Amino acid sequence: YAKYVLQVDTKEDSARVAKFYLGASELDLFANTYDNGDGEAGVDVATVIDNLIAPNFEATGTLTFDVTSEVKATLGLDNRTKVETNLPDDVQEDLKVVIGDTSTGIVYSGTVYDLSHGGFSFAKIKDISAHTVGSTITVPVTVSWALENGKDELETNLANAQATGDFEKEFTLSLVAGAVLTQVD
């Protein structure tokens, strides 16, 4: 069965200030064994049996930065951070993206639609002290699906078309997280 995937994959090298690597991860937003309502009236996609493909409540991955900096700096996401997807706009509006959490601080909170159609300004992740060598910084990324959205027919049609090969490729959702280290005077 096809799946929705979140991929986070960015490399950046700023020799004067720092070097870091941002790893990649996959999040399955769709599973083929999920039943969200046992056939109750009005439930999304679900029937009395498990769906062909149905949304999970949420999936979480991790941005991992390996940071080295000789100077005091700020690590943050910049305007290269965006979503690329072939999902219809209607579905994009129901997918929420949260970068960060209450322990690390919320870096971004919005919808896939916002990230794919709008701009992203600089968002601070963490202050980096001078003489930092090989520090690993992790930031969670959570994508959640608003299940009670009244779009059962659309979601079912997309799932059926994907599973029967009506599309040339799977539906994809890629989050490109552009990150920078900025020197702090």
Identify the residue ranges that each predicted region occupies.
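Short, polar/proline-rich extracytoplasmic segments that appear immediately after membrane translocation
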Residues: 1-53, 165-171, 176-185
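Surface-exposed interaction patch
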Residues: 4-5, 50-120
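C-terminal, structured domain-capping segment
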Residues: 6, 62-77, 124-185
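Generic "edge-of-domain/loop-turn" microfeature
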Residues: 9, 20-22, 27, 34, ...
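Surface-exposed charge patches in extracellular/virion surface proteins
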Residues: 21, 32-36, 72, 80-82, ...
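Generic preference for hydrophobic/aromatic residues in regular secondary structure cores
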Residues: 21-25, 32, 67, 75, ...
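Feature targets compositionally biased, intrinsically disordered low-complexity regions
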Residues: 22, 36-41, 60, 75, ...
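Extracellular adhesion/glycan-binding regions together with long Ser/Thr-
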Residues: 40-55, 105-153
